[in-house]
Amino acid sequence: MRLEEIVFVSPLGLRYLCLPKYISMKFTEQKLKGVFVIEPQVFGDSRGYFMESYKKELFEKYIGVVDFIQDNESRSSYGVVRGLHFQRGEWSQSKLVRVTQGRVYDVVVDLRRTSPTFGQYVGIELSDENKKQLFVPRGF
């Protein structure tokens, strides 16, 4: 959907952006249970774009209750490889990963020894162009 499709023009010629009450996101669960690729609906025009990167109502519907406790941002120079994000016990937390500039190939590895998918992984390209996000639940 393009922004032009949801712009209201008043009788005086003023333009108002009328965003729908329910902006959708596509949630696709990966082969590792609880890991989701999320594709937000993007409304774009010549001025730029608008999207919701998180909506509690939708996350609870598709993923369950998620209590995000912090928001981090990092910048990596070209060619940098980051290490595994691994936490367990009281330090574990769910993560919502997205890229605001450039692109990364993000990999989630199941390191839970008792899991039926132990040792398996999923990888996805996240970029400022595709706007995809990766949800990684606690324990990974």
In which residue ranges do the predicted regions lie?
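Non-catalytic, conserved peripheral segments adjacent to functional cores
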Residues: 24-129
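Conserved metal-binding segment of the jelly-roll/cupin
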Residues: 126-140
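Acidic, Ala/Val/Gly-enriched low-complexity intrinsically disordered segments
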Residues: 4-9
